[in-house]
Amino acid sequence: MSADAPVWIDEVFEDRVRYGLRGQILWEETSPFQKITIVDTEHYGRGLLLDDCWMTAERCEVCYHEYLVHPPLTTAASIARVLVIGGGDGGTVREVLRYAEVEQVDLVEIDGRVVELSQEYLGAIGTAWADPRLNVKIGDGIAFVQTAPDASYDVILVDGSDPAGPAAGLFNREFYENCRRVLKPGGVFASQAESPDSFLAVHLEMIETLSAVFAEAKPYYGWVPMYPSGWWSWLYASDTPGQFQKPQSDRLAAIEPQVEIYNRDIHQAAFAQPNFVRRGLSARQG
């Protein structure tokens, strides 16, 4: 289904808050997994919603993708082999493939229609689909890591939607344990970790669960204006304590001229943890 008339395109949060942009619906369909909507907004350009939740848009997406990708890729011991779970819009792999050190990226996306429609409509976001280092696999990322060989990836990035529908299994301990097994020594796992304002309980649970699986798990924070509350978070986990604080200078020097937001100062500031998050974690631990 497609339509031309400008409309207000809203994400309704818990039937009490709306986040909306005015624009046109370019395409809408229901795949075997979810409702997919492609829009052209007046403020942020073309974008994607899944099950009526904002995922990305051309003039907003760097706020999300740069934060997910660059803290782990500047700090991992090696970045030769990277696994991306989700990320069918192509923005995450675009950022990963900025690094010359990266030799192979495997993108595992459960919904092939997200990839196809993103390639058709969101070319300004997914600019790296033709990179020969990229392998796109349509399938279940949870099942993929269950059967992946031990120590086969240097970095794992989880670019999933909220913990519902096809992404629900990306938020449990068994999945995190498989990711840890699949990582090489010195490897890094990172995932989007919801809004500490709008989804605090989920955010705290993710930190707690990842902290039980990895030697260290640290949340980091930024802004994504089109997401609920605008305040967003990601989680960095590894078995090397303090690794998150040590971006490699050569990688920083190579990446900073290429990107819009990420730099050394942003990296350090992002890991500052709000007091209410600290208190929430302490309360959960008894």
Swiss-Prot record:
Amino-acid positions noted as binding S-methyl-5'-thioadenosine in the UniProt annotation, renumbered to this chain: 34, 109, 140-141, 166
Origin: domain of life: Bacteria
Subunit composition and interactions: Homodimer or homotetramer. Homodimer.
SUPFAM superfamilies, A to Z: S-adenosyl-L-methionine-dependent methyltransferases
One annotated GO molecular function: spermidine synthase activity
Record-level GO BP terms: spermidine biosynthetic process
Residue ranges of every copy of the PABS domain listed in the record: 6-239
Enzyme Commission code(s) on record: 2.5.1.16
InterPro entries found in the cross-reference section: PABS, PABS_CS, SAM-dependent_MTases_sf, Spermi_synthase, Spermidine_synt_N, Spermidine_synt_N_sf
Subcellular location: Cytoplasm
Positions annotated to bind spermidine: 65, 89, 159-162
Key words, A-Z: Cytoplasm, Polyamine biosynthesis, Spermidine biosynthesis, Transferase
Gene3D superfamilies on file: Spermidine synthase, tetramerisation domain, Vaccinia Virus protein VP39
Pathway the protein contributes to: Amine and polyamine biosynthesis; spermidine biosynthesis; spermidine from putrescine: step 1/1
Protein's recorded name: Polyamine aminopropyltransferase
List of catalytic residues: 159
Catalytic activity: S-adenosyl 3-(methylsulfanyl)propylamine + putrescine = S-methyl-5'-thioadenosine + spermidine + H(+)
One protein family per Pfam: Spermine_synth
